[in-house]
């Protein structure tokens, strides 16, 4: 009996040591994550930044901005895909984050009718196909549930907008997408937020985007005969632009590349990042 007790005690000691070692490793990983977040070059508003050489964005007070290099690091820290061209803007409380990227695929004609139900099915199929790459990387799969906001095109602002509801192991999030049409292509804006915060976040993003503009000579109205024209219209912008064209041509390597990059942004694995950034700017204000 006594021998059994000592064996049990010894086993408990081993387990306790393993738990302490695991906790120490977790603390070290957390500190490494915080250190990498701290090292990013956070640009605080109010200021105006040049975006990808053809446009400008005014960052309001109480907002922050990351350039392309720092945005790539920020995304990859959270197991989100990046092609290294996106920039990020967000309020300091990190209730939402928006990513901007210009695609020089040509002038997109805006006279196409949008079939929202058909587009939703295509997006759901694309998301499922993209999960193959996420599984290969050891990342959690995504499920596109429904529209949060069906696609709407504003002929005055030349902005196409929609929002989708996505589920993952970490929970539910909303991706709100905007395409701002220009002379030589379009700027994609993807906002990530909690579904409960969507209405307020949309309003805030709309305010921020009033400070975004193409440079002189680069607006949609500046298009001239002879300029490059995209091979697709508004509907294809929603389901992937160049990938939609590739599907018609059988260019499956292009389609595969799109599926790897599609649904880059979901609020997954960002709790620590959001908490740290909030605390960072709170400390700076207090100081």
What function would you assign to each model-found segment?
Residues 7-15:
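Bacterial N-terminal signal peptides
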Residues 54, 61-62, 94, 180-187:
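Short, solvent-exposed coil/turn segments at beta-strand boundaries
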């Amino acid at each position: 009996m006594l021998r059994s007790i000592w064996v049990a005690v010894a086993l408990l000691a081993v387990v306790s040591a393993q738990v302490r070692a695991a906790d120490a490793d977790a603390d070290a990983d957390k500190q490494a994550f915080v250190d990498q977040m701290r090292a990013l070059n956070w640009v605080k508003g109010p200021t105006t930044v040049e975006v990808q050489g053809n446009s400008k964005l005014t960052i309001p007070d109480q907002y922050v901005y990351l350039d392309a290099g720092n945005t790539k690091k920020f995304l990859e820290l959270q197991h989100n895909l990046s092609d290294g061209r996106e920039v990020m803007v967000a309020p300091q409380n990190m209730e939402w984050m928006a990513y901007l990227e210009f695609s020089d695929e040509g002038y997109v004609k805006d006279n196409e009718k949008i079939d929202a139900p058909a587009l939703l099915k295509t997006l759901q199929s694309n998301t499922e196909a993209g999960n193959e790459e996420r599984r290969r990387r050891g990342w959690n799969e995504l499920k596109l549930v429904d529209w949060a906001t069906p696609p709407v095109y504003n002929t005055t602002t030349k902005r196409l907008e929609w929002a989708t509801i996505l589920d993952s192991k970490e929970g539910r999030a909303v991706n709100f997408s905007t395409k701002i049409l220009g002379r030589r292509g379009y700027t994609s804006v993807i906002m990530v937020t909690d579904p409960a915060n969507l209405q307020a976040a949309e309003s805030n993003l709309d305010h921020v985007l009033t400070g975004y503009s193409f440079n002189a000579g680069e607006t949609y109205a500046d298009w001239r005969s002879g300029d490059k024209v995209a091979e697709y219209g508004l509907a294809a912008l929603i389901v992937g632009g160049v990938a939609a064209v590739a599907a018609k041509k059988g260019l499956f390597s292009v389609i595969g590349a799109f599926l790897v990059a599609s649904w880059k942004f979901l609020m997954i694995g960002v709790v620590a990042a959001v908490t740290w950034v909030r605390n960072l700017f709170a400390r700076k204000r207090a100081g």
